[in-house]
Amino acid sequence: KEVLNFYSKDALKEIFDNARKICGNLPLAANILYAINDYGRVVRDACEAGANIIITGAGIPTNMPEFTKDFPDVALIPIVSSARALKLICKKWQRYNKIPGAVIVEGPLSGGHQGFKYEDCYKEEFQLENIITPVIEEAKNWGNIPVIAAGGIWDKKDIDKFISFGCAGVQMATRFIGTFECDADPKFKDVLLNAKEEDIVLMSSPVGLPARGVKTNLQFSIENHTAPKVQCISNCVAPCNRGHEAKLVGYCIADRLGAAYKGDVETGLFFSGSNGYKIDKIISVKELMEKLTKGE
């Protein structure tokens, strides 16, 4: 059956219930984009559903604590790409008497939307290893907020490097697509298994930021004006302006990401970090964690 891209509190609750069955009493996090419409409602719904942590990127969440005041034990973790952004967040959060539980610093090799201009994604000064230290120094000014590195981290060597810089941990996403447990359609995984390094590119997005993904048939159909028609149903992200930006770039991001998740190779948008082409076989999360911790 066709599923429209509306937000559903019941669906969110079901996702949390399923995740809770797997993780038990361990901390459970929700990643909620600041750019979505009804951001505050979704944050509150996630807290009600049992989130222990809320992670937010796609904007600078200066009022994030406003929506969790009834849930004081929920840790709030913003995603930033500069020390300046962290300083602004911490200053704004003073009125809520709150500081971030941690901060994620995402460099320009990550999959999906970037916190940089297109040309800056290629400049040395904006690479993760060069933006991480100023954020760590800024974090010390607010009580040693734990700093988590993200974007292009692939193996134990990368993990060890950023831990040595003073990071408390790392965030990884793309490599976990190549696991049996990842719930994306097998055809999504095949796209990465078959991708070459040059296939993973930066592209335009209705959100107004460069986004990294695998160049597939969707990009060719956009160029040839044969991509699926843009019909804004849910008004999901504010920068898209009810589908106006989607029509300019040639695709609806919610529809195309949904198509990729369901394995539609013809019309799907397959986000991936810059190292996605390195996935060469599907393994278990257990095996992957052993590789990441033992360096195999």
Task: Name these PLM-found stretches.
Residues 1-142:
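Active-site entrance/lid segments in N-terminal catalytic domains of soluble metabolic enzymes
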Residues 57, 150-151:
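Short His-Asn-centered micro-motif
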Residues 64, 149-150:
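Short, surface-exposed recognition loops or helix-turn segments adjacent to catalytic cores
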Residues 110-148, 154-296:
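Conserved active-site-proximal phosphate/metal-binding subdomains
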